[in-house]
Amino acid sequence: PIAGSMVLAAILLKLGGYGIIRMMQIMPTTKTDMFLPFIVLALWGAILANLTCLQQTDLKSLIAYSSVSHMGLVVAAIMIQTPWGLSGAMTLMIAHGFTSSALFCLANTTYERTHTRILILTRGFHNILPMATTWWLLTNLMNIAIPPTMNFTSELLIMSALFSWCPTTIILLGLSMLITASYSLHMFLSTQMGPTLLNNQTEPTHSREHLLMTLHITPLMMISMKPELIM
């Protein structure tokens, strides 16, 4: 069920990050070096999840692994125990909650019309559903974290916190962001561009689907213009 995937990615996955934040409050703040293995594992796990996204052919699996990779950045930022790292982790959890939920919603919109989640079988939707393609583009750009979205603000805070803690981490973080941009563009091009493989008539997008996407994108845009509300 798509509703379960949306709630899982947007809310339940973030409860783990919230639990880590609460647990870190009772840890000694001066002993950041003891968390070095966890930070390295979190960043390496984010890269591996991103690489797994690149070889996925199932649309929902790709989005799910994308959520895993972003949570790796969140864990690494929380472990540093700095104000910038904590703000970046909180902001990324909220931003990615909206983004991943919107991606699952769009995946369901595609599935209802093609009855498949295989990327290569869902191509050519920009000719059939141009408004849905617009939503796909906006959501993928937010997943890539381009400015001035809140995703960009959060990743910039996390990058600054990690770099000030250990400059070497910029290599792992930069590689993770590069792969994120690669699979996000691959997902958009695979589902929207190219010749369509559908022979039957496809129903247009409904008002409820546009309303659902608006309720995902609009709050994210508004918080992006005033990020101090959550930081």
Curated annotation (Swiss-Prot):
GO cellular component, as recorded: mitochondrial membrane
Keyword set, alphabetical order: Electron transport, Membrane, Mitochondrion, NAD, Respiratory chain, Translocase, Transmembrane, Transmembrane helix, Transport, Ubiquinone
Main localization category: mitochondrion
GO BP terms in the entry: ATP synthesis coupled electron transport; electron transport coupled proton transport
Cell location: Mitochondrion membrane
Keyword Mitochondrion tagged: yes
Enzyme class, first EC level, given as a word: translocase
Enzyme nomenclature, EC number: 7.1.1.2
KW Iron-sulfur (keyword) present: no
Transmembrane portions of the chain: 1-21, 34-54, 63-85, 89-111, 128-148, 156-176
Catalysis performed (reactions): a ubiquinone + NADH + 5 H(+)(in) = a ubiquinol + NAD(+) + 4 H(+)(out)
Molecular function as annotated in GO: NADH dehydrogenase (ubiquinone) activity; ubiquinone binding
Signal peptide range: none
Function: Core subunit of the mitochondrial membrane respiratory chain NADH dehydrogenase (Complex I) that is believed to belong to the minimal assembly required for catalysis. Complex I functions in the transfer of electrons from NADH to the respiratory chain. The immediate electron acceptor for the enzyme is believed to be ubiquinone.
Family statement: Belongs to the complex I subunit 4 family.
Name of this protein: NADH-ubiquinone oxidoreductase chain 4
Species whose genome carries this gene: Gloydius intermedius (Central Asian pit viper)
